[in-house]
Amino acid sequence: MTQGKASAQDVINALNLEPHLEGGYFRRTYQADHRDWLETAAGPRYLMTSIYYLLTEQSPVGQFHFNQSDILHYFHLGDAIEYSLIHADGSLQTVVMGNDVLAGQHLQLHVPGGIWKASRLLDGKNGFGLISEAVSPGFDFADMEMGNRQKLTTAFPQHRALIEQLTRDED
């Protein structure tokens, strides 16, 4: 970045990001065009894809969603981002990605396929948090399910308050 404090809009413009379905902003930066496709139960997929993903004060939540593929997250800059992961057995895991490793924040996070995941920007001085994701097999919208509030609260009633915060009201 140039001298001075970058705003969320500066980062959106510099990286050519666009609004994401789950919240925040993104841009696909890589797909393994030079590799053979992987055959999956849902059809052929790239071996790997990667995106930039940005949460901002104006769009601070990545809504609960479910991916079939494994995803590696890499923190780059800005404010910390809290991830809420609901496993199939109903257990909840909370991980904070950020650059303060001495405070227990993580620079990398692996989320296996088959876990409900949501993220939210934590308060900080920047007004945004930027990560990258590497997805294998490569991301395809057919392999992703957005979290339905009623379905998730029925399946995981012990996490009702969190689910209500991190899903859209479909009514």
How does the language model describe each region?
Residues 110, 130-132:
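A structural signal for short, well-ordered beta-strand segments and their strand-loop junctions
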Residues 1-109, 119, 124-126, 137, ...:
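Non-catalytic, conserved peripheral segments adjacent to functional cores
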Residues 132-134, 138-142:
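N-terminal segments that mediate ammonia production and transfer
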Residues 113-114:
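Extracellular beta-helix/beta-solenoid repeat scaffolds
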